[in-house]
């Protein structure tokens, strides 16, 4: 806050809602005091036995592209559902494909699918998280942040996905500069599920 104290809000990451939206909604109904909900997808569909991206074995480039398409289908369903604050780490498959398996994958060629996701989010009043990815390539990176802005998106949070203390706050300022370079002039926090806009 303005007096130098850290404000602690209440939030959750709600993963895999696309497996059972009714269950996800029932869960949220039991937590009315939340300030912030990240909607996220970490698994592929039943075609891949709901396997978590983290555990997916090495594969060919064409198999990886099929996995990205499968993932984006679930992300689009989640975006259309829209009962959350921001969509977390849109380009998450790249973390595991590139950083864990040494591939050179991108979401290039999926512009239509990503645009559909962004339009659904904007229509539902949801935003996106720019995940600093513990200092690696942000999820999503500048190309997709620019597209989000061009489509009318304004709600963006910066998430460090820290998991351990040494990553808390990592690259937060640099990521805000990235947002600004993509035409996004505000970073958001949330209070009582409503975005609060802070000028960068």
Positions of the model-derived regions?
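Extended substrate/RNA-proximal surfaces in nucleic-acid metabolism proteins
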Residues: 1-121
């Amino acid at each position: 806050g303005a007096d130098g104290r850290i404000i602690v809000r209440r939030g959750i990451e709600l993963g895999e809602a696309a497996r059972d939206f009714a269950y996800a909604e029932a869960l949220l109904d039991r937590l009315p005091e939340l300030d912030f909900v990240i909607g996220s997808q970490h698994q592929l569909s039943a075609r891949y036995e709901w396997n978590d991206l983290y555990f997916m074995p090495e594969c060919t480039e064409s198999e990886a592209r099929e996995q990205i398409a499968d993932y984006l289908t679930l992300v689009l369903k989640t975006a259309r559902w829209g009962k959350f604050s921001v969509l977390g780490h849109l380009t998450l498959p790249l973390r595991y494909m590139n950083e864990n398996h040494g591939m050179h994958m991108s979401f290039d060629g999926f512009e239509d699918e990503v645009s559909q996701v962004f339009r659904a989010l904007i229509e539902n009043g949801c935003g996106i998280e720019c995940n600093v990815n513990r200092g690696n390539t942000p999820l999503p990176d500048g190309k997709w942040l620019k597209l989000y802005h061009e489509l009318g998106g304004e709600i963006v949070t910066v998430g460090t996905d820290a998991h351990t203390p040494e990553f808390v706050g990592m690259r937060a300022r640099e990521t805000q500069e990235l947002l600004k370079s993509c035409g996004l002039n505000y970073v958001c926090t949330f209070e009582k599920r409503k975005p609060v806009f802070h000028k960068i």
